[in-house]
Amino acid sequence: MKVSYECGPCFLRQAREALDLSTDDDELKMDVMEEIFKFLSDNFKLGANSNSTGSAMHNLVKQKTGCIDPYRKEKIEGNEIALKYLPDVKKIIDEDDSLENYVKIAIIGNILDFGAFTLDDDIERVIKSSLKKDLTIKDIDEFENSLKTNDKVLYLVDNTGEIVFDKLLLAKIKEYGLDITIAVKSEPILNDACMVDALDAGLDEFGEIVEIGCGTVGYVDSQISDEFREIFNNHKFIISKGMGNYEGLTEIDLSNKEVYFLLCAKCGTISRDIGVNLHDMLLFKK
């Protein structure tokens, strides 16, 4: 996906956030922010790839501050809080164990910022109210048909915290008898899930966890490893979580694949690209 004018303020917000998490040295923050402005001045242009631009910016922060995983604390806390609520979520979904509700739970995980919740927050209320919302795009019948007609699936996860709720959908997928391969980032980027995060959340219970070979914002086809490219090419059925993976996968030819995107349209650029409203929950085939 290409950048829009709205991506500019978002990049700067992310840069400030990453800097605040990386260092307390205000002088260093200023120096790095100056370099980020120079980088964006040279690279933030019409036709630029959004994921590649964001990845390079975050790597600049890591390189200059020496902090390779600025979001580590937030990632650990996100998983811990989500795991704490998982039994309650299971009870909620037991009231209606339709495939659509499992999909909704996985998308709700994408909506919730687990790092912003405490153990006293009424997350159960948030989940129940979200489950009552309809999916704006709901290719659920095609999705179930793919579950029934394929023998394996590649599942591209997104953030920590969110991956805990993915466990429920992964368990549901296992009921269809599919072999599941779960793809995570090889290096830290934002609060995206890496191998250690996926193992901490228990995703290895559902299938083999593989690394994509890079630490990019979302999916960047030019940077994945040869090993992961072979895995990707050998899977016809792919489930993609979150906006970053949508931005990257829509840059490549998917005509010979069954790719389903599960996400909440939290960004104006992406909501317009898909043709939905901001904050809509979506399951759609591309």
What are these regions (language model features)?
Residues 184-186, 190, 199-286:
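C-terminal functional extensions of proteins
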Residues 127-129, 154-156, 209-217:
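Short, basic, glycine/proline-bearing loop/turn elements
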Residues 2-150:
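Electropositive, gly/pro-rich neighborhoods at or near active sites that engage anionic ligands
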Residues 152-154, 236-237:
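Structural motif
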Residues 160-182:
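Histidine-anchored nucleotide/phosphate-binding helix
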Residues 111-130, 135-136, 186-195, 201-206, ...:
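Conserved catalytic alpha/beta core of Sir2/sirtuin-type deacylases, generalized to analogous enzyme cores
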Residues 167-168, 195, 250-253:
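Short amphipathic alpha-helical segments
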Residues 151-152, 178-182, 258:
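Residues at the starts of beta-strands that form the adenosine-phosphate
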